[in-house]
């Protein structure tokens, strides 16, 4: 786990607890997307370098997002500004999404294949994973031409490498002792 992930964890946890308490998970997801979109804008990055005061920086965010930002979001923006933590917004968002998935009993699966899979193949993979993990499954699918053939499935910290490249490596390792 990276340092940014470690720092982001308590922020995401606090935001998620507020979202659960107020039944506003989707709203908070949109707020986090909004804040990280503004913070990552190339014209806005100059402000994040510390050249302006945290109070003024907070005011800019709050002014831009008047229609989406409530009191709790204002407090988050002020806290991120005072602690100079806008650089970990992606980590906070990713952690928030993982907390939501866990709360809704969903696992997030990253699936990579050497070539494009049809939707019915992805659905078959989803069904197998749902039976295996006994949870609903959300698949994030990408084509990776670097994989010779087959696929790689990543669930949390577990990787199922079903690629030809991995099979060749295992064969090579077994022949080389």
From Swiss-Prot:
Membrane topology according to the record: Peripheral membrane protein
InterPro entries: ATP_synth_OSCP/delta_N_sf, ATPase_OSCP/dsu
Transcription regulation is among the record's keywords: no
Cell compartments where the protein resides: Cell membrane
Entry's Gene Ontology cellular component terms: plasma membrane; proton-transporting ATP synthase complex
Family: Belongs to the ATPase delta chain family.
Function noted in UniProt: F(1)F(0) ATP synthase produces ATP from ADP in the presence of a proton or sodium gradient. F-type ATPases consist of two structural domains, F(1) containing the extramembraneous catalytic core and F(0) containing the membrane proton channel, linked together by a central stalk and a peripheral stalk. During catalysis, ATP synthesis in the catalytic domain of F(1) is coupled via a rotary mechanism of the central stalk subunits to proton translocation. This protein is part of the stalk that links CF(0) to CF(1). It either transmits conformational changes from CF(0) to CF(1) or is implicated in proton conduction.
NCBIfam families: ATP_synt_delta, PRK05758.2-2
Description of how the protein assembles with itself and partners: F-type ATPases have 2 components, F(1) - the catalytic core - and F(0) - the membrane proton channel. F(1) has five subunits: alpha(3), beta(3), gamma(1), delta(1), epsilon(1). F(0) has three main subunits: a(1), b(2) and c(10-14). The alpha and beta chains form an alternating ring which encloses part of the gamma chain. F(1) is attached to F(0) by a central stalk formed by the gamma and epsilon chains, while a peripheral stalk is formed by the delta and b chains.
Stated name of the protein: ATP synthase subunit delta
Lineage: Bacteria, Pseudomonadati, Pseudomonadota, Gammaproteobacteria, Enterobacterales
Gene: atpH
């Amino acid at each position: 786990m990276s340092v940014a992930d470690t720092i982001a964890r308590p922020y995401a946890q606090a935001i998620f607890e507020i979202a659960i308490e107020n039944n506003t998970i989707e709203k908070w997801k949109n707020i986090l997307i909004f804040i990280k979109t503004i913070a990552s804008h190339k014209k806005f990055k100059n402000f994040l370098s510390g050249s302006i005061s945290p109070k003024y920086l907070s005011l800019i965010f709050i002014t831009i997002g008047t229609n989406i930002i409530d009191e709790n979001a204002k407090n988050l923006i002020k806290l991120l500004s005072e602690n100079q933590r806008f650089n970990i917004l992606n980590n906070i968002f990713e952690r928030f999404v993982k907390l939501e998935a866990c709360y809704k009993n969903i696992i997030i699966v990253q699936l990579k294949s050497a070539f494009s899979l049809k939707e019915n193949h992805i659905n078959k993979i989803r069904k197998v994973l749902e039976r295996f993990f006994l949870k609903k499954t959300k698949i994030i699918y990408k084509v990776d031409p670097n994989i010779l053939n087959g696929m790689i499935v990543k669930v949390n910290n577990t990787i199922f490498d079903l690629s030809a490249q991995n099979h060749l490596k295992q064969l090579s390792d077994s022949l080389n002792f």
